[in-house]
Amino acid sequence: MHYRFLRDSFVGRVTYHLSKHKYFAHPEEAKDYIVPEKYLADYKPTLADDTSINFEKEEIDNQGEPNSSQSSSSNNTIVDNNNNNDNDVDGDKIVVTWDGDDDPENPQNWPTLQKAFFIFQISFLTTSVYMGSAVYTPGIEELMHDFGIGRVVATLPLTLFVIGYGVGPLVFSPMSENAIFGRTSIYIITLFLFVILQIPTALVNNIAGLCILRFLGGFFASPCLATGGASVADVVKFWNLPVGLAAWSLGAVCGPSFGPFFGSILTVKASWRWTFWFMCIISGFSFVMLCFTLPETFGKTLLYRKAKRLRAITGNDRITSEGEVENSKMTSHELIIDTLWRPLEITVMEPVVLLINIYIAMVYSILYLFFEVFPIYFVGVKHFTLVELGTTYMSIVIGIVIAAFIYIPVIRQKFTKPILRQEQVFPEVFIPIAIVGGILLTSGLFIFGWSANRTTHWVGPLFGAATTASGAFLIFQTLFNFMGASFKPHYIASVFASNDLFRSVIASVFPLFGAPLFDNLATPEYPVAWGSSVLGFITLVMIAIPVLFYLNGPKLRARSKYAN
């Protein structure tokens, strides 16, 4: 682990301030540091500095550089611009930038192993809290007995957890984009609260209290899911971003399936309450590890801190940072608009976002519906034990991993290499893979439903579930990348916040009616066939959505006031 990981971690920052900058000092605070002339109090801007950064006219990414997706926007091409802007004198202010294109303090210049370790940490964090969504579901029967409630009510804690991490991004995503807060402090503080909440959740003695605690747990679990992709983008070059996001999202997509796997073992060996003690332990371990090893990577926050250090060293109050300039111009009204209204406006008014939200919400809901459907067949028909039922969820993980190993080399061939060859690459490059994912998703649902009968081997439904999961992974990856490449940087946070809220609300209600849907459509020979077929026909129709984007993507983006 590199020294800067500890220096810029939560513990490192606290130690730095408590020791009055004696420990974990930064390069600018070294005795032999030579302050660049432009930061000195008596520095006079020359004609060469006249082309200053215009914060209102030019979108700047979180590394303090012109945003790649904003450049060359006239031809709707995805391009990259990693050139540092050396023109950093803005009127009477001196805007702090990186010390050259190869500044080692810039996370995008970290060595590959350090980037990989950072992405692993974000993925582990996501997995350690995200498995909490369905971790207790193997113990629902025991929960129903203890609290004297029905199945639908016993499913409410799952529903409210999912709603919680749909609402959370409306609060935490804007905070993580503010230079004062950054990403790491939000990760650590919310993770600490999540860990603490697992204690009363494990001890609560009524369903109302359990539901409230589960909602709060989901709310404080949301930053890693909502901001994890942005953290990956902090350290990964633009042309490698789809690969980095795929690596991180393995934890996000596989996490809910790990929950029932461990939950089934704990329920059999102890009780449903121990599923929450397990969450306390695993997320607590994650908290301790990340306190020491998770560095800040948000460029605006790092430059904000650098500006503060340079002001202290030089006594020059003209020194500022991009983040400080943005905060000084942000009004309370603008903050409310960006945080609460714009995600809703974009969802309703943008056809591209609305259609993607509907499709992804459906796919997301199907994955959560498996937590209700698997017991109907594997326990009710094949008489699996609870632990054996837990292992069946690993078929979802296997399907996702296989899809990732196929997706990464394909996307490198179709996206990364053309960009490195300086060829034009359009957002629609992701869509053919999404169409393939849609076909796999639909095929998997039909395979799962019609192979799950009383006479065939149970491996058939597992193959169908794995195929469904593979398709879901491809749809998630490609449509998220398509949205990220299609909209202006200023609106990306609102676009994804709307998606988080929309898909979480829709997915949260599916487990409530999942079992009744399959029970009402069941036949003696095929207990889940017709229920799966209903979902299969719906997803078959929805394949038209990526096909529409592939045929008319540029036209749809041209009509949008938010798109590139």
Curated annotation (Swiss-Prot):
Outcome of gene disruption: Leads to enhanced susceptibility against fluconazole, methotrexate, 4-nitroquinoline-N-oxide, and cycloheximide.
Extracellular side: 137-151, 205-206, 264-273, 372-390, 450-455, 525-528
Consequence of substituting residue 326 to A: Leads to general drug-sensitivity
InterPro entries: MFS, MFS_dom, MFS_trans_sf, Multidrug-R
Keywords assigned by UniProt, alphabetized: Antibiotic resistance, Cell membrane, Cycloheximide resistance, Glycoprotein, Membrane, Transmembrane, Transmembrane helix, Transport
CDD domains attached to this UniProt entry: MFS_Tpo1_MDR_like
Membrane topology note: Multi-pass membrane protein
Glycan attachment sites: 453
Cystine pairs: none
A biological-process GO annotation: response to xenobiotic stimulus
A Gene Ontology term for the protein's cellular component: plasma membrane
Region Disordered, residue ranges: 60-101
Cytoplasmic side: 1-115, 173-183, 228-242, 295-350, 412-428, 477-503, 550-564
Effect on the protein of changing residue 309 to A: Leads to general drug-sensitivity
Keyword Cytoplasm: no
Entry's family note: Belongs to the major facilitator superfamily. CAR1 family.
Anything else known: The overexpression of MDR1 is a frequent cause of resistance to the widely used antimycotic agent fluconazole and other toxic compounds in the pathogenic yeast Candida albicans.
PANTHER family in alphabetical order: FLUCONAZOLE RESISTANCE PROTEIN 1, MAJOR FACILITATOR SUPERFAMILY
NCBIfam families hit by this protein: 2_A_01_02
Protein name: Multidrug resistance protein 1
The encoding gene: MDR1
